[in-house]
Amino acid sequence: MKLEKYSIGIGDRFAHQGKAQLKAIMKANQSGLNIAPVWNKSNREHLYTHTHPADVRKEADDAVAMLGFKGKYFVDADHINLSTVSSFVETADFFTLDVASFIGKESRYEEKQAFIASCEKYMGSLTIPGMEHSLEVNETLLDRIASKFLAATQQASEIYHFLKTEKGEGNFITEVSMDEVETPQTPIELLFILKMLADKGVPAQTIAPKFTGRFNKGVDYKGNIEQFTKEFEEDVLVLDFAVKEFGLPEEIKLSVHSGSDKFSIYPIMAQVIKKHDKGLHLKTAGTTWLEEIIGLAMAGGEGLEMAKTIYANALEQKEQLCAPYADVIEIDATQLPSVEEVKGWSSEKFANTLRHIPGHPDYNPNFRQLIHVAYKVAADMGKQYTDLLEKHADIIGACVEENIYERHLKRLFNL
């Protein structure tokens, strides 16, 4: 099973927007692209929204059937580990192996020494085709990389081989994720992480490193654009080298997590993947849930009241909602409007404050990030929330489709 060159993860917290998401992708594909939709949902999201992996499979299959989509599509068991993978085995065909929590864990001395010995041919000045400067590789560097990443790649191997036994070799896509950590992986670290994965028999088709800068949820990239550009291109060159040198799948590509709304770096990624003829996987989820709230606000009446209630409850539960996402949000509490202020907002004011239009006078990234992590508030409302999604499906669907196509795919693929 092979992933298409270009793919987009389209998470959907409440499984009501699959058709609208797919419409956006089909619209982009009319330009000659072949973007594969990947419906992704994590175990944490399933727990918060009281759903099951089978619900995601049904949503994907139903959307594809309703719209007559003929391309490849996938269902991603997002951010799984050995303790959570089993419930996804039957319905997923794409597995994101999250091994970030194993970074820095101790490996046996003998394993580290064996890895260092296997890298002898790369010692000294290592030239990566296309890279401006050679990489300096020595035993100290390799020991540090092994100490940091060997346990994580071993964990990836254990999850992969469990899945291989359960599903059969070649019957699923493997992604390895190391993004939910504080410190970015450098291109030279990525190179030897890829060697470890190859040595351990993990045929990763996508890898999600932690990039330089901040990838906060639902808002634009924050960081040194010049540094990101350099590292992103070097990562792409490292992947090319790893395919030829280590025998990894030739279609391996970078996966960008928390990838929605990073408008300032989309042109950079587009330029680099075009220059080197490489693929890309962009993972999104919360941006669609935010469009549901925007759509409800635009509907007015009970929809607007629901949106205001969700914000009020989110503000009250702010600490517990933000805690699981501490590494990927930055909210200035002094910039959050009061519940009383929001009560007086019109549909347009609420939608414009939440919608990600950089430069719009009403746009508030703090408000947006809080709503982003507040989907549990809506989940706890149960049918009260989902009934309104169905009642206002047309306006919400239009918001979702516009967001994925106009603000994401058009920017990312220069449409």
Set out the residue ranges of the language-model regions.
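Active-site capping/gating regions of soluble enzymes
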Residues: 1-59, 65-67, 83-103, 108, ...
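Hydrophobic "anchor" residues on beta-strands that sit immediately upstream
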Residues: 74, 175, 253
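Glycine-rich tight-turn/loop motif centered on a GG-T
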Residues: 111-126, 130, 134-147, 216-231, ...
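Short, conserved phosphate-binding/catalytic loop or strand-edge motifs used
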Residues: 170-174
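Short, well-ordered beta-to-alpha junction loops that form the rim of enzyme active sites
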Residues: 178-180
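A generic local structural motif
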Residues: 61-62, 176
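Conserved, mostly hydrophobic/aromatic
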Residues: 78, 176, 257
